Curated annotation (Swiss-Prot):
The keyword Oxidoreductase is assigned to this record: no
NCBIfam families in UniProt: c-di-AMP_CdaM, diadenylate cyclase CdaA
Gene this protein is translated from: dacB
Species of provenance: Mycoplasma genitalium (strain ATCC 33530 / DSM 19775 / NCTC 10195 / G37)
Pfam families tied to this protein: DAC
Lineage: Bacteria, Bacillati, Mycoplasmatota, Mycoplasmoidales, Mycoplasmoidaceae
Membrane topology recorded in Swiss-Prot or TrEMBL: Single-pass membrane protein
Domain of life the protein comes from: Bacteria
Major localization class: membrane
Protein name in the entry: Diadenylate cyclase
PROSITE patterns in UniProt: DAC
Length: 200
């Protein structure tokens, strides 16, 4: 009998506490808003980190595949400076960054999309078959028109531009008017990609 009474009192107490906490949370907008903002921020950052990791993995595997098969390609990653003028020249799309899609674009040499560049914004492909201004720099004769246009874009914006040579299969990056050859090792290449995309 005593045990039942104590159990009943405990349940009543917990129920009242639960009701009080719910009422407090709903009545106190500041508390509620803080909780909502906190959880939204945590979820948003987690999703952004996952999107970024997937993008780095996909970009690395795409560049290596194109390199092995010696398929020429230009992939420009937009940073702070808008690339809208070049997006408008090409074909606007809206697609996740997919190695399969990029292979379809660059492997078909008879397609008009083959020679142009792909532009990426916020980890999504937003333009294909875009063309950039050629650099006027005197560069190594081993570099072709893709390298010259990638370098030209990097001189006019803070975009990071990745190039695969159709002749040698070498992977390069153009950034701030400078072009550099990247590693063909998967892990080192991904480290380099992360480094250049994280630079300010």
């Amino acid at each position: 009998m005593v045990v039942n009474i104590l159990l009943f009192i405990t349940l009543i107490f917990l129920l009242l506490l639960f009701v009080f906490l719910i009422a407090f949370a709903f009545l106190n907008k500041r508390v509620r808003n803080y909780v909502v903002r906190t959880w939204t921020s945590v979820f948003s950052k987690s999703k952004q980190n996952l999107d970024k990791k997937n993008f780095f993995d996909n970009l690395t595997s795409t560049l290596l595949r194109l390199s092995v098969d010696k398929i020429g390609a230009i992939i420009a990653i937009e940073k702070r400076d808008s690339l809208d003028p070049y997006i408008n020249i090409g074909y606007r799309v809206s697609s996740d960054f997919s190695p399969e899609l990029l292979v379809t674009i660059f492997y078909n040499k008879s397609s008009p999309l083959h020679d142009g560049a792909v532009i990426v914004r916020d980890y999504k492909i937003i333009s294909v078959s875009s063309y950039f201004p050629m650099t006027r720099q005197l560069i190594d004769v081993s570099y072709g028109s893709r390298h010259r246009s990638a370098l030209g874009l990097s001189e006019k914006s803070d975009a990071v531009v990745f190039i695969v040579s159709e002749t040698t299969g070498k992977i390069s990056v153009a950034l701030k008017g400078v072009i550099k050859t990247l590693s063909s090792n998967s892990d080192r290449l991904q480290d380099e990609i992360i480094h250049y995309l994280s630079s300010k």
